[in-house]
Structure formats: structure tokens, C-alpha cells
Amino acid sequence: MRCVPVFIILLLLSPSAPSVDAHPMTKDDVPQASLHDDAKRTLQVPWMKRGCCAMLTCCVGR
């Protein structure tokens, strides 16, 4: 039971994310790539270098 007040105080002290973007996007801003886009790009590069498809059916004869 001693942990509950400490946990509540820590929750109150933690900063919350703003509900609105603090800096409005301008025409010079470039959208950031998401983690999903980075992972997808990383996984696609080896397939392109080998010339194989994702199902490995076209790699069988090589």
C-alpha cells in the first residue's frame, strides 16, 4: 500500500503529450519517416540486391 501514493505522485509529475502540435507545419518542413517506413525500407534493400521476391519462389533456381 505504500507504493500507491508514490505511483500517483510520479504519474502527476510526468509530462503529458500536448494534444495539439506546438509548431504549425510550414512549407519548408519535411515530414519525418516513421519507424515502420524505416523497417520496411531496410527489409526491402536485401531483396532488391539479390533479385528475389518475397515468397522465395523465384530464388529456388538460382
Curated annotation (Swiss-Prot):
Keyword Disulfide bond included in the entry's annotation: yes
Keywords assigned by UniProt, alphabetized: Amidation, Cleavage on pair of basic residues, Disulfide bond, Neurotoxin, Secreted, Signal, Toxin
Signal peptide, first to last residue: 1-22
Localization in the cell: Secreted
GO molecular function terms attached to this record: toxin activity
Modified how: Contains 2 disulfide bonds that can be either 'C1-C3, C2-C4' or 'C1-C4, C2-C3', since these disulfide connectivities have been observed for conotoxins with cysteine framework V (for examples, see AC P0DQQ7 and AC P81755).
InterPro entries: T-conotoxin (IPR031565)
Residues of the propeptide: 23-48
Primary localisation category: secreted
GO CC, one annotated term: extracellular region
Keyword Disulfide bond recorded: yes
Pfam families, A to Z: Chi-conotoxin (PF16981)
Tissues of expression: Expressed by the venom duct.
Modified residues (Valine amide): V60
Free-text note on domains in this protein's UniProt record: The cysteine framework is V (CC-CC).
Similarity section: Belongs to the conotoxin T superfamily.
Name used for this protein in its record: Conotoxin Qc5.2
Species whose genome carries this gene: Conus quercinus (Oak cone)
Classification lineage: Eukaryota, Metazoa, Spiralia, Lophotrochozoa, Mollusca
